[in-house]
Amino acid sequence: MAPDSTFVLLDGSRQTTADMKGRVTLVNFWATSCAPCIAEMPRLIATHNRYKAQGFDTMAVAMRYDPPSYVVNYSETRKLPFQVAIDNTGSLAQAWGDVERTPTAYLVNKRGEIVKSYVGEPDFFALHQLIEKLLADTPS
C-alpha cells in the first residue's frame, strides 16, 4: 500500500493518499536542480495530459532541499498541468521509502497500492502500457 500521506500543494491546499483512491496516480519526487527531472518533465506532462480524462493523476513532490520559490516559478512558467506538492520537512520522501535520488516515482493503482517504482527516468512506452492496464482494472 502507498503510505498514508498528506501532500501540501502549492496553493496551500492538502491532498491525502486516501483522496487518490479510485484513480491511478504517478507520485513523482523531483527537484528543480535535478537535470534528469527537468529533462523528463515534458514526457510527464504529455503522459498526464494523455490519460487524465480516463482517471489518471500525477502528483509531483518537490524535495525538501528545493527552494519553494524555485518550485513555484518552475511550475508557473512551465504551466504544469498536474498537482505539485512541496515536501518541506522531508517526511514524504521518508514515508515513501527514504527517497534520496531524483527522479523517483511510484505508480499507485486505484486501490492505493504501489504497483511499480522507478528510480531515474522511466521507460515511457512501458509506463503507458501499465497505466492503460491499471485504468482498465475495476477495483473490487
Q: What would you call each of these model-derived segments?
A:
Residues M1-D4, H128, P139-S140:
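N-terminal targeting signals for export/organelle localization
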Residues D4-T25, W96:
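A short beta-strand-turn-helix
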Residues Q15-I38, L44:
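Short active-site neighborhood of thiol/selenol oxidoreductases, capturing the structured segment around
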Residues M20-R23, A53, P81:
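Active-site acidic short loop of glycosyltransferases
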Residues V24-T25, F56, P103:
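Alpha/beta-hydrolase fold active-site loops
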Residues L26-N28, A60-A62, Y106-L107:
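Hydrophobic beta-strand core positions in alpha/beta domains
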Residues I38-R78, I86-A95:
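Structural microenvironment flanking redox-active thiols in thiol-disulfide oxidoreductases
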Residues N73-P81, I86-L135:
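Thiol/disulfide oxidoreductase modules built on the thioredoxin-like
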